[in-house]
Amino acid sequence: MQNLLCRVPIFAGLGDKALKLLLENAESAFVPAGDVIAREGDVNDCVYLIESGEISILKNFISSNPVVLATLGPGDFFGEMCILEALPRSATARAAAESKVVSLASSSFYRLFEKMPKQHSILLLNMARDLSRRLRRLDELYAACQ
C-alpha cells in the first residue's frame, strides 16, 4: 500500500516513516460497480485512495438528478475534506467500475500531527495546493458556462 501513497500527490515528500505511520490502520476493500462508498450527508471520517477501478463523485441538486462532478481513477483520492473539517460528506462516491480502495481514518492524520508535525505540515500544504488546483478548475468551468 505504501507504493500507492507514493503515487498520490498529497503524500509527496512525506518520507517512508510518515507513510508507514499513516498506513498503520489503513483498510483495503474491493467495491463492486454501482456500490456507494460514501454518501452525501453521511458522517464519515475516511480519506479514500483508489488503487484500481473508477469512482464517480456525484452531487445531489434539488431540481435534478445527481450530477457527476468528477470521475477518478487509480492514484486519485477523495474524502480529504474530512481531515480539514468535521462536517458531513459533501458528495457521493460511487464505483463506476469494480474498484479497489484504501481507506485512511482521520485518526491516522492526527497521529501524524502528534508524532511528526513537520510531515503533517507538508501534507497540509500539499492538500492546500490540490484544493487550489480544483478550485481553479471550477472557476474555469463556471466562466465557460457564462
State where each predicted segment sits.
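Cytosolic regulatory regions built on CNB/CRP/Popeye-like sensor folds
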Residues: M1-Q146
